[in-house]
Design a protein with these regions (language model features):
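Extended beta-strand/beta-hairpin segments
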Residues: 1-71, 83-169
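Alpha-helical metal-binding/catalytic segments enriched in His/Glu/Asp
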Residues: 72-77
Length: 169
């Protein structure tokens, strides 16, 4: 098992001593494929295919952007919950997170201006088996998990998004 405190201790010490060293930039690049309903996504450590959802004409053989957003939230929430439980000394047998999102495709297809483009509701369901945990510990686990989950906090408090367009050759 990973000793989380010993792994994070030198990082926390460095970030306290040099706050600027805690700032990172993550990058993802989408590249054109042979079809207008798919692209490759390169995050530097992995490359994967994304497709349009079948409800807007995609083939359904790869994750759509909505799947990836929900997957990012599920991964972040699950890993954050595991890390917080470990840091709090709460033994767990299982931590599973299911994320669902509801949207109306008429918005993205331009069928109705009254229908928003994007998710209307996103729901998270945590399934935690921690037989020895007290109700107070589970309440604190929930609070800290929601507080420290980067993707959840980003969705709750959207950052400024800047776009830049360049005409290629």
């Amino acid at each position: 098992m990973v000793d989380l405190k010993s792994v994070q201790k030198p990082l926390k010490e460095r970030y306290r001593a040099d706050p600027e060293s805690s700032r990172i930039t993550l990058t993802a690049r989408g590249g054109q494929e042979g079809t207008p309903i798919a692209c490759s996504v390169d995050i530097g450590r992995a490359v994967y295919e994304a497709q349009a959802h079948t409800g807007v004409g995609g083939a359904g053989t790869a994750a759509c952007s909505g799947d990836l957003l929900l997957g990012a939230l599920a991964a972040c929430a699950q890993i954050t919950c595991q890390m917080v439980a470990t840091a709090m000394g709460i033994p767990t047998d299982r931590i599973a997170v299911e994320v669902t999102g509801d949207l109306d495709l008429r918005g993205t297809l331009g069928i109705s201006r009254e229908v928003p483009v994007g998710f209307e509701t996103i729901k998270l369901h945590f399934d935690i088996a921690a037989p020895a945990a007290t109700p107070e510990q589970l309440a604190a686990l929930r609070e800290k998990t929601e507080q420290y989950c980067v993707v959840m906090q980003t969705l709750l408090r959207p950052p400024e998004i800047k776009t830049e367009w360049a005409k290629g050759n």
